[in-house]
Amino acid sequence: LICLVVCALIFQGCWHHESAVERGYNEKYIGEYTRKIAFPIGGIGTGMFCIEGTGALSNMSIRHRPNVFNEPTMFAAIHVKGYEYGTRILEGPVPEWKKFGAPNSSRGDGGSWGMPRFKEYSFQSRFPFAEVELADQNVPIDVKLVAWNPFIPTDEDNSSLPVAGFEYEFHNTSNEEVQAVFSYNSMNFMQTPGRGKAYIDAAKNGFILRQTGTENEPFCQGDFMIYTDNPQTVVNHNWFRGGWFDPLSICWDNLEEGRMEENPAGLEGAVGASLYVPFTLAPGETRNIRLYMAWHVPYSQERIG
């Protein structure tokens, strides 16, 4: 019986190897090679998160310790006016291995995993840059995302800033003018329930996810800012408040309809926020939209090391 099991495992391994598309040295990652990529983003010693092979963000570890299972609900999306399936998260499909065993998965939790994504994608690493390319036959726009770290050789100070940059390149592949809305959407993942106050504050062309500390737990304090350099940016600082999955569902409804809703900042208990950048592409035209993230967590809960 043991021999049969060993033979079966060897056969399976050989079959898997033969069925896989061979990847050349330093080439793009595609297909199965993208499934467990986690490219670190963040300045030296400032905490970090990762961009995955699909373009998703995970491993959110900005509170002075690794938190590799922390995948907050935050995502970029595109809405193309006049296309039935023209609203997509700017990521490749969720890998199968992530769909089972996720925290609280018995309750149906999975963040944005059930929302439509681009079908074709690839990943390429050129540290400090990570590049994700996206395409889908239902969307007349090809997308290239370049994410980068503040890594500057011989400049350790600026290389140690708690910031990250994302540049989205949109190319109109159709023969018609395309009207679209880029958005970035995030729940307030800085919130620590029962500890201080959580709210979402205003920033120029963006928003700040905030959590205050307390006298006994100052380490709960933290800010995470998401913003663009585009003056046409519209910001919704306060998602719909409801039970279960209502806030995210209403957020997605707004995206599908191309609605750029505006709500004021500073309301305690705000669930999430979105920013929107409308744009138009002529046939064959390419346009870039830049997004930035920065964070500040001044106190640590760690007592060792």
Where is each model-derived feature located?
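C-terminal motif of bacterial Sec signal peptides marking the signal peptidase cleavage site
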Residues: Q12-G13
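Polysaccharide-binding surfaces and accessory modules of carbohydrate-active proteins
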Residues: P150-N254, E302-G305
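Short, hydrophobic/aromatic-enriched beta-strand segments in well-ordered soluble domains
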Residues: L134, L145-A147, F182-S186, R287-V297
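Primarily extracytoplasmic ectodomains and periplasmic/lumenal surface modules that are beta-strand-rich
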Residues: I44-M48, G53-N59, N175-Q179, F189-M190, ...
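Sec-dependent N-terminal signal peptides
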Residues: L1-A8
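Extended, loop-rich substrate-binding clefts of extracytoplasmic carbohydrate-active enzymes
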Residues: K99-V163, F240-L275
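Short Pro-Gly-centered flexible turn/kink motifs
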Residues: M48, V178-A180, F279-W295
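Beta-strand-rich N-terminal accessory domains
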Residues: H17-W97
